[in-house]
């Protein structure tokens, strides 16, 4: 069976004010689709799905028949809040067909996830600090929200932590618990998931607390499910956690920096991902403009930094690792480029392939493995 890999890139299409106060002038037209050359790592433009407003994060369902995109906005249909859009994925060419859109009931939705049973979509609203759950119909369309949770509180940083800022949602492999890093609260909140009703309830141990001022952003699990890697935006660290799937609780193993010891400039973290092999973890630094590379101890889950690779651009907000684990694509938000690196399977180190693809304000990278014959 022949296959090909398509790459879907979310962009900012309109001006947006971030939590830092910075206003970014979005230059994208919507969702960009490319074909990955599985030998060279080069990207061939396929199409632009125009008219999608600020699709800053994307998620496929498990069948890859449907794609969901947040619309990172502060108002929707005249009310405070953003929205999430559903698309059908054409199986032969990978074209997207708009299905419908629903409000997320919070401002600046920045992350979307589909649960393992493809029955619900989970959205984190960054600016207002909330989580929204939406049922998915059999035809891929979204129904009105089945649950909504508003976070409360603040952190020690008056500029960045004056209120709650939910930044992402991750589920465990058993589909029993949902985890929400909240940058404003310095907490990884834990919810029990009722997959039938699409409801979330605080766990018996409702959160894991990180160092004050750390600002947790994203959580990535090891393929074994035994360890989690929590990236902290504000203090540029990774918290390495052991996970108990029975209770939905975490214990800290250690904390590692994402920046070189001699770096003295300003930088914040963005994304964290585990290689499909489970042997390496990667984290992006915005300011240092690099990818930190770590080797995973397969016995303990602990990390050892093996180096940093410049992303050849500014502000790597996101990156993607292709399903084979051979290539990593870094999205440089402020210099409008997608840069391809080859992953060394033995060391985890990154080597530029020379492929630099122009993409206006790219902020999310997702892959679709498509059968061609």
Regions found by a protein language model. Give the residues of each.
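Asp-box/WD-like beta-propeller blade repeats and closely related beta-sheet repeat scaffolds
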Residues: 94-168
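A short beta-strand motif characteristic of beta-propeller blades
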Residues: 44-50, 97-103, 153-159, 203-209, ...
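Beta-rich, blade/repeat-based domains predominating
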Residues: 52-62, 105-117, 152-175, 210-227, ...
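Short, conserved, GDST-rich strand-edge loop motifs in beta-rich repeat architectures
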Residues: 4-26, 70-83
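Short loop/turn segments immediately following beta-strands, especially the blade-tip
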Residues: 34-41, 87-94, 133-143, 191-200, ...
